[in-house]
Amino acid sequence: MLNTLLTHLINPLAYIVPVLLAVAFLTLLERKVLGYMQLRKGPNIVGPYGLLQPIADGVKLFIKEPIRPSTASPTLFLVTPMLALTLAMTLWAPMPMPHPIIDLNLGVLFILALSSLAVYSILGSGWASNSKYALIGALRAVAQTISYEVSLGLILRSIIIFWGGYTVQTFNTTQEALWLLLPACPLAAMWYISTLAETNRAPFDLTEGESELAPGFNVEYAGGPFALLFLAEYANILLMNTLSAILFLGASHMPAIPELTTINLMTKAALLSVVFLWVRASYPRFRYDQLMHLVWKNFLPLTLALVLWHTALPIAFAGLPPQL
């Protein structure tokens, strides 16, 4: 009984609570970074240096009255934000930090499959709102996410050829001698840009378009359901950056000081997340046709060529003697 309680309740909570705390402070960091890049302070009133601002925001959102449009689908309208957050939390299960909560043989495919399911929560929330603005925003979001998942899948295919397995832990063994960032530099650049688009971040934030007159699929949401969608979005940002660090930025295991494994991975993921915020502060929004042109006419041919190259190269050199 105690063992079941530990594995089914305490272990998942030990993952979920720190992720949600990290999400809360990522929002504060984003507002601070944007503030300083626009020559102002950012939040600095609530608590010392504004550190309690995310908690105040969370409490404010969850005690607001949940307004549901009278014409909206009652069940789907509330289920889709919960689905979005559930998927965002489940995605962390196979991540080696340094040990995964579930040890899957096909961890990479699990992450790819579940991140694809997030499309349904976006489409469902846009459709259930029964608003033309929400539906148009949802359709744009779905088209963008599906398009960039193609390039993400092909880039992962190439990296899997590099490390020779679908288990996320095998990256440690592969990258002990050399970070994959160096031999797979074009892949890393395309992967990072694709994760920006996949998580609907600037300059690819056409789905939300906060500065526009009507934002995207979440236009009808307020209070608690909006907070759930918001948490899911930022949890996905942290997940994608942690995955980028795992794939390209070397083994998190340090043989000399094994205690620093988690800190090593967290530092790399945090630095990649800060670059996400820098990009948001620096670049204007893409036009929709440019967004699609980038993935279908630039990334897709290049990733296909690299998949063929990485498949053919080991076979071509297999006949050479090892001492060469």
Swiss-Prot record:
It is a multi-pass membrane protein. GO terms for cellular component: mitochondrial inner membrane. It comes from the Eukaryota. GO terms for biological process: aerobic respiration. The chain crosses the membrane at residues 9-29, 76-96, 106-126, 146-166, 177-197, 228-248, 259-279, 299-319. One of its GO terms (molecular function) is NADH dehydrogenase (ubiquinone) activity. Its EC number is 7.1.1.2. Keywords: Electron transport, Membrane, Mitochondrion, Mitochondrion inner membrane, NAD, Respiratory chain, Translocase, Transmembrane, Transmembrane helix, Transport, Ubiquinone. Belongs to the complex I subunit 1 family. Core subunit of the mitochondrial membrane respiratory chain NADH dehydrogenase (Complex I) that is believed to belong to the minimal assembly required for catalysis. Complex I functions in the transfer of electrons from NADH to the respiratory chain. The immediate electron acceptor for the enzyme is believed to be ubiquinone. This is NADH-ubiquinone oxidoreductase chain 1.
